[in-house]
Amino acid sequence: RFLPQGGQHPIALGAAMCCDSGHKTLPVVTGGAYLHLGKNAPVQDEAAVRNALALFGSTSPSYLILQSLDKCNQILSEGYPLRLLQCCGHLTRLRRELNEAAAAKHCPGPLALESEPLKVTLDAAVLGLSGTELAEKLRAAKIECEYADPRYLVLMFTPDNPPQDFERLAAAVLCIVEELVGPVTLPEETAGEFAELERGLHRCCTIRQAVFAPQEQLPAEQAVGRICAMPTVSCPPALPIVVSGEQITPAAAAWMKRYHVEEVSVIREPQ
């Protein structure tokens, strides 16, 4: 929203309405968010929107959260776009530095991938590591990532990160790159496996029916053929391997094992 290419915001792209979380990368207390109405929203009356929110809202709201949103509004109006642009510049240089170091060590691909302006996505596979292994190495250097999976690792930055944070990450990753010995082979592409998973899934009932049905927990490998009741995702929001109401296939169970999903909730079968 505050970058020169701010047209990427959902409202600018035509959304009628969207909710922006304020507590991830802005100085807002957890739980704070902004509700935006676009020009094509079906309701434009602010009072009507507030009344609709009151249907599910509390009569005792957190004034601490609301106050933090008001304070954040002040920060956003006082030079925030320039600070944000400077942060993005730091990250662009960081990605370039990491990729140049990886290329110098003959890594089989770019280390820092193209991603959102405030995120650094690292392909740990080009270092011969899994994303979780790379996360452990960074944790030893007192750097905590936002997300790690069997291949990738994601870090998030804000304009409030001081310059030494960028330098510390660069130093830690460059040290790992320098330790590389011998050629690294990238794992095979998994696009075909995703396609196989999609083809094999079959919906047996609606999501609502599955979520409210009697359930039981089973080891993932024993759940093949059963109907998923509640999806298991490692880092919400995320794409579930199987959606509630779908039958769990061998391919789905294999993906659960890959992402370390040990148990899954299934609809209990009648006795």
Residues of each region from the PLM?
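Conserved PLP-enzyme active-site core in the AAT-like
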Residues: 1-108
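Short, glycine-/Ser/Thr-/acidic-enriched flexible segments
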Residues: 24-25, 40-42, 61, 71-72, ...
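Conserved C-terminal alpha-helix-loop-beta "cap" of PLP-dependent enzymes
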Residues: 99, 103-251, 255-259
